[in-house]
Design a protein with these regions (language model features):
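N-terminal positioning helix adjacent to the helix-turn-helix/winged-helix DNA-binding module
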Residues: 384, 453, 460, 503-504
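Short glycine/serine/threonine/alanine-rich loop segments
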Residues: 45, 296, 483, 501, ...
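Conserved aromatic
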Residues: 407, 501-502
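Generic N-terminal initiation segments characterized by hydrophobic and/or small/turn-forming residues
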Residues: 386, 414, 462-464, 506
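Key residue(s) within conserved catalytic/signature motifs
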Residues: 60-63, 225, 504-505, 509-510, ...
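Helix-turn-helix DNA-binding segment
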Residues: 270, 449-493, 498, 509, ...
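Histidine- and acidic-residue-rich, metal-dependent catalytic cores
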Residues: 2-449, 456
Length: 518
């Protein structure tokens, strides 16, 4: 790939993934970024404010995968509920609760409907506080790793607050919400309403919701200028438009900084499901090790490792009701699963630097005999690095717990790789190199474990943390470790305090960052 990547390109790509997570067309968040900048221009805000608004608009929902599990547990399809409530008036709690209940009870039998309604009515405030705290905490951890300053980080802590004090988790109100986030609150809602309904409806909503949901001065600006801004959006390419606005001097990601950014993307992806924690990191490491077994140049190893970090970008577009389903997928569900490498390709190809990773990243489910997806590429058309990642994806996937099965023993996963190779599905050199790198066969290196005492945690604390990060309840953790529920809860609170987090999602991210997934 190109040796450097503009930070704006990287963050704009993350914005595309956030669109997927909310069931919106790609570039929706880019469009809202443009609206936000134009509002800053008309209002005469200084360069510091405009630069902060730019990054906040593109990163607003970067914590969204962190609480996808919690949303899906209650609503089933977390993407659908997000899409349905995206344009609703967050300053009107009664309207939001009504629509949330309607979605949550649709299609359920009467007895189950009553239970869901009762849960929402009794627990809505507590659940929302915890849910939105998760999103903000994860966003802050990820953005800190991208070296953003306090202005961006402070604004993102108010992602779910509202002008009138009806937001979460702190019910902040008025100008206690940072100006950049007040701007983004308005322009992201207006982009969605204008796109889904009409510019006129968006302008009307800005006026109707002023002083309740939005800063009234900003809402008035939108009422006055929104029609012209929507016309500009209609004829502008959002990707090019957003990159043209990137704050100068452009920050270039290269070397370790580029690897760090791509690892942020990997963690953003894997946070989506408790079963995926650390998957992309693990694939990247094993792919790099296998590439060295094959004698790849270090440049080729680096490209393969980076492609492996972002190969699953497309999973953000599919709900956890599919990824975490405990039973067999229907044909229709599996058809949707087969789309995710294509979606990875679509997101990466907008940036020339990231598009160079597509040769391996978007081909991770292809097979040498043409039986894979999404392009059905055969061996004679496949890149050897891509073949390595294909074998890695299978091996790593098999050795991890899934919703419908326990993890394979490493030896059983190795046997399955050999079987697929013998049937022509995997490239022999790639498959054998992966097995050697994973610790199987002649010349194999012993598998390296994670740190023994990450963060100074005891063995028992690590066990508790792993299970909590996977989404197990306190009772389930107690049963798994043969301790009482009360003791398990004590351990969880102690561990969270020790590592400096307050939510399951943040704990899951900490686990990934400190290589204690397994």
């Amino acid at each position: 790939m190109r040796s450097s990547l503009r930070l704006g390109e990287f963050v704009a790509t993350l914005a595309l993934a956030q669109d997927n997570a909310f069931g919106q067309p790609l570039e929706s968040q880019l469009r809202s970024c443009l609206l936000a900048d134009w509002m800053c221009e008309v209002a005469g805000f200084d360069r510091t404010v405009r630069d902060t608004v730019y990054w906040v608009a593109l990163l607003r929902y970067v914590g969204c995968t962190g609480h996808a599990h919690e949303v899906a547990t209650l609503f089933g399809d977390e993407i659908a509920i997000r899409a349905q409530t995206l344009v609703h008036d967050a300053g009107n709690p009664a309207e939001v609760i009504r629509d949330v209940i309607a979605f949550a009870t649709a299609g359920r039998p009467p007895e189950e409907r009553d239970q869901v309604v009762q849960f929402i009515q009794q627990n809505a405030r507590e659940w929302a506080t915890h849910n939105f705290s998760s999103g903000c905490e994860v966003a802050d951890m990820l953005v800190q790793r991208l070296d953003f300053g306090p202005d961006v980080r402070d604004a993102l802590r108010f992602t779910f607050e509202r002008w009138g004090g009806t937001g979460y988790p702190a019910h902040a109100k008025g100008d206690t919400i940072p100006l950049p986030m007040r701007i983004v609150h308005l322009t992201q809602d207006m982009e969605a309403i204008g796109r889904l309904f009409s510019p006129e409806k968006a302008i009307g909503a800005a006026g109707d919701r002023r002083d309740r949901t939005y800063d009234p001065a900003l809402a008035d600006l939108f009422v006055e200028h929104g029609g012209r801004w929507f016309e500009r959006l209609r004829v502008m390419d959002p990707w090019n438009g957003v990159l043209a606005l990137e704050p100068e001097p452009h920050r270039l990601l290269e070397g370790d900084a580029l690897d760090g950014a791509l690892t942020v993307a990997a963690d953003f992806i894997d946070l989506k499901s408790p079963y995926m924690g650390g998957h992309s990191r693990q694939c990247a490491q094993l792919a790099a090790d296998a590439a060295r077994v094959l004698g790849f140049s270090e440049d080729a190893v680096t490209t393969l490792r980076r492609g492996a970090l972002v190969h699953d970008f497309g999973i953000t577009a599919l709900p956890n009701s599919i990824w975490d389903k405990p039973g067999t997928l229907t044909r229709a569900e599996y058809d949707r699963v087969e789309l995710h490498p294509m979606l990875t390709e679509q997101m990466l190809r907008r940036s020339p630097a990231l598009d160079a990773l597509n040769l391996v990243a978007s081909a991770h489910h292809e097979r040498c005999d043409g039986s894979g997806y999404h392009k059905r590429v055969r061996a004679d058309a496949a890149d050897l690095g891509a073949c390595v990642l294909q074998a890695v994806e299978i091996y790593v996937g098999l050795t991890r717990e899934r919703a419908d099965r326990p993890p394979f023993a490493a030896s059983d996963a190795a046997s399955e790789l050999r079987r697929l190779e013998s049937h022509g599905a995997l490239e022999p050199r790639a498959s054998r190199a992966v097995l050697v790198a994973a610790g199987h066969g002649e010349g194999a290196a012993p598998a390296s474990g994670g740190p023994k005492n990450p963060g100074g945690l005891s063995r028992r604390e690590v066990d508790v943390l792993r299970l909590a990060a996977k989404g197990l309840t306190t009772k389930q953790i107690g049963e798994r470790l043969f301790i009482s529920t009360k003791t398990a809860d004590h351990h969880i609170q102690h561990v969270y305090n020790k590592i400096g987090v307050s939510t399951r999602a943040a704990a899951a991210l900490w686990v990934m960052q400190h290589a204690v997934v397994h």
